[in-house]
Amino acid sequence: MSAMDVMIHSSSFLLPCDETSTGTRYALVVLNQSLPRFTPLLWEHAKLRLCADGGANRIYDELPLFFPNEDALAIRNRYKPDVIKGDMDSIRRDVLDFYINLGTKVIDESHDQDTTDLDKCILYIRHSTLNQETSGLQILATGALGGRFDHEAGNLNVLYRYPDTRIVLLSDDCLIQLLPKTHRHEIHIQSSLEGPHCGLIPIGTPSAKTTTSGLQWDLSNTEMRFGGLISTSNLVKEEKITVESDSDLLWTISIKKTGLSIQDHTP
């Protein structure tokens, strides 16, 4: 085993806050795609909540649907983003005015067409006091997957632009995060909430050798590249997965449809 530092990964943000014992602090970015059913849980975990442009429409329109027995206005007042940031080409005027009246900070970056809205939000979080106060910051991004593929590719590119920042892209079906080649990785599986399907994907550069443990089909100094072998439709077999590679890899794992109750995990 090499002398690489070990990076620990856990989807503890899918657990109720009172069951989370890690020292991780979370920031949440909501992008302009359908909200995962567990968005209220992520919101409760987060210390900083941002909407990327049209993501504010999703919070305004879709969150009340998760609570059909509660007043929609009360839900909108409860789930107020701290910041709305982006090029402001997607957010509706009525939504923008609503959150401005609630005191949400709005940052218009329509002058910057060279970065994605997710990129803009990541930069804000990296420069925030939350990031300066803790070394255990993790950024959760909903709505980063699904919809147009070029948008998805842009969001995946953000993972590679900030390899020293822990970013997790989330949809209703799965999560994706970067495993930097600078570390050996231990992934602790929340088996009641995620898996068993998973994958390790080299995007950008091939991997000459990747070694894993804890998977149905483990890799042993295996070469992976597009046009050759990539590890998709693999299965987790253990509660802890280890990964070591000479290349940055994307780790993805399915999120189960059961075991995540909105009512159980919200204030």
From Swiss-Prot:
Gene3D superfamilies assigned: Thiamin pyrophosphokinase, catalytic domain, Thiamin pyrophosphokinase, thiamin-binding domain
User: What CDD domains would the database entry show?
Assistant: TPK
- Mind telling me which SUPFAM superfamilies this protein's record contains? Thiamin pyrophosphokinase, catalytic domain, Thiamin pyrophosphokinase, substrate-binding domain
**Has UniProt tagged this entry with the keyword DNA repair?**
no
**Record-level Gene Ontology MF annotations:** ATP binding; kinase activity; thiamine binding; thiamine diphosphokinase activity
Asked if the Swiss-Prot or TrEMBL record annotates the protein with the keyword Plastid, the reply is no
Tissue pattern of expression reads: Expressed in roots, leaves and flowers.
Function of the molecule:
Catalyzes the phosphorylation of thiamine to thiamine pyrophosphate (TPP). TPP is an active cofactor for enzymes involved in glycolysis and energy production. Plant leaves require high levels of TPP for photosynthesis and carbohydrate metabolism.
Name it.
Thiamine pyrophosphokinase 1
What is the species of this protein?
Arabidopsis thaliana (Mouse-ear cress)
